[in-house]
Regions:
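Short, Lys/Arg-enriched N-terminal segments with co-localized hydrophobic residues
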Residues: 2-18
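Extreme N-terminal tail/first-helix region
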Residues: 16-31
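Short acidic-aromatic linear motifs embedded in glycine-rich loops, typified by GG[WY][YF]DAGD(H)
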Residues: 25-26, 87-103
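Short, contiguous alpha-helical
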Residues: 28-32, 36-39, 49-92, 133-183
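Residues within well-ordered alpha-helical secondary structure of globular protein domains
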Residues: 44, 67-70, 110
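Surface-exposed helix-capping loop/turn segments at secondary-structure junctions
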Residues: 44-51, 118-128, 163-168
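Acidic/histidine-rich alpha-helical segments that form the ligand environment
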Residues: 95-132, 139-152
Length: 183
């Protein structure tokens, strides 16, 4: 069953949101941004491109999506969200397709939907507590940071694969002036 999360009420210190509130907000924002980028890439790729391995030492976009589902599922959904851990990490990399891209997107979306609920419900005590995950002993804070960093890292790899395969600009920052300086 689903555990109840502690300390979820909004807390303010000197009129500002408490650090756990800021962490939850920023972690969710960055994961959602990565999710949209991955969805955009997967939608653009054909089924063969989705499972294309550039060489023996690189995995496909499809493998990376499965790997992210496994990582988020294990570290957030199972460890912090109290779901059973059925991860088979090697299978994430051994899959060669042709898993339908719709199924792949749905798996990612379902994994992240639960993770968003879990992260959104974390309180100060959850972030400070030490948890055991994948053979490591980590605080809740370290788990959230790991998942966001890991998700972003592989989102970049998925973007690179897509750009290499399709020779496109992904348009992530279309309409934004990225040459603005701090004012």
């Amino acid at each position: 069953g689903r555990r109840s999360f502690s300390g979820r009420s909004r807390r303010y210190i000197h009129g500002m949101p408490a650090m756990d509130e800021i962490l939850r907000t920023e972690a969710l924002r960055r994961l959602r941004e990565g999710q949209e980028r991955i969805r955009s890439c997967v939608l653009r790729l054909g089924d063969e491109q989705l499972w294309h391995r550039p060489n023996a030492n690189l995995v496909s976009v499809g493998n990376l999506v499965l790997h992210l589902c496994g990582n988020v599922g294990q570290w957030i959904n199972s460890t912090l969200g109290n779901r059973p851990d059925h991860r088979r990490r090697d299978d994430e990399f051994n899959e060669t397709g042709p898993m339908d891209k719709r199924e792949l997107r749905e798996r990612l979306d379902a994994t992240l939907a639960y993770a968003y609920d879990v992260i959104g419900g974390l309180g100060q005590a959850d972030l400070e507590r030490t948890w055991n995950v994948q053979g490591f002993s980590e605080t809740g804070l370290a788990i959230v940071l790991h998942v966001v960093e890991h998700f972003s890292y592989h989102t970049g790899q998925i973007t690179l694969h897509t750009k290499l395969l399709l020779d496109i600009d992904t348009g992530y920052y279309a309409g934004q002036d990225l040459n603005r300086t701090a004012e």
